[in-house]
Amino acid sequence: MTIELEDLGLTPELADVMQRLARVGGQIARLISRNGLETDLAAGVGTNAGGDGQKALDVIADNAFRAALAGSAVAHYASEEQDEVVTLGEGALALAIDPLDGSSNIDVNVSIGTIFSIFPAAESPEASFLRLGTEQIAAGYIIYGPQCALVCSFGRGVHHWVLDLDAGIFRRMADIRPLPAETSEFAINASNYRHWPKPVRAFIDDLMAGADGPRGKNFNMRWIASLVAETHRILMRGGVFLYPGDDRKGYERGRLRHVYECAPIAFLITQAGGGASDGCDPILTALPDRLHARTPFVFGCAGKVACVAAYHDLPGQETSALFGTRGLFRS
């Protein structure tokens, strides 16, 4: 598997890393297409560093990416599936990766993916990743869906490739267009409504009010439970995604990892003209304090992300900006 990288102005080292990522991505796509025929990729095999259950494909993907990057310019490899940073060599780059995002969807044939982030290597392994998201030199994902696609930014817009399985090449497509200013879709797990903080409930209440509410139009809700799939949809047609912190034990800071998931997605979305925050402040200017730190996450069309932040500025007794106290499923 190879990827078309002509005219992107990449250094030889970065281009080589992208070729290695694409090669493994293509291999994983083929493996997923045969799930259940030879191996149950959704079989539980343990628990990762963050306390989440691991599927067989989580471990397979992590091992494959780590092995492929050995001997490359990647000195430090940080994986959501590993407790600590793995040192691969003495190169000039550091790569953070969620090898298999959305693994709970493997056995139901829903799109899953790989998320990656590339930094210049720092003096120590952890320092290479505990830094501002604005310091990323590349970030992207591979989505394993009806098509296998790779989306990446090198800080100059967002590029898009689709895997030509017959030729074994990720073909470059038209670049991702800027996100629209307006949107009529939002993504959130509404079953957790009772646990959300008031500002999030207020924002969703006003969207649910539709044409009769302060937004003056109807909205559709989406929820795939696969961050890569949610991101791809938003990049293709707009929208806003919310995974807030809530009052459940272990969910106070949400469930998504800053280093492995939120920072790279925030980099992509920002390069597409959108916004990304923890509900109040930009993700890209937040400093994670540990490798597996979690953060609330809101991203998508810039206006909607800013609107969520504005709801957090309302007086504490307010639960809706214009319509007073109202529940999600009440008029």
Swiss-Prot record:
Main location: cytoplasm
GO MF entry, a single one: magnesium ion binding
Binding site for Mg(2+) 1: E80, D98, L100
Cofactor binding annotation: Binds 2 magnesium ions per subunit.
GO BP: fructose 1,6-bisphosphate metabolic process; fructose 6-phosphate metabolic process; fructose metabolic process; gluconeogenesis; reductive pentose-phosphate cycle; sucrose biosynthetic process
Cofactor(s) the record lists: Mg(2+)
CDD domains: FBPase (cd00354)
Amino-acid positions noted as binding Mg(2+) 2 in the UniProt annotation, renumbered to this chain: D98, D101, E261
The keyword Plastid is assigned to this record: no
Keywords from the named record: Calvin cycle, Carbohydrate metabolism, Cytoplasm, Hydrolase, Magnesium, Metal-binding, Plasmid
EC number(s) on file: 3.1.3.11
Pathway the protein acts in: Carbohydrate biosynthesis; Calvin cycle
Binding locations of substrate: D101, G102, S103, S104, N189
Assembly and binders: Homotetramer.
Protein family (similarity comment): Belongs to the FBPase class 1 family.
Name of the protein: Fructose-1,6-bisphosphatase class 1 2
Record organism: Cereibacter sphaeroides (strain ATCC 17025 / ATH 2.4.3)
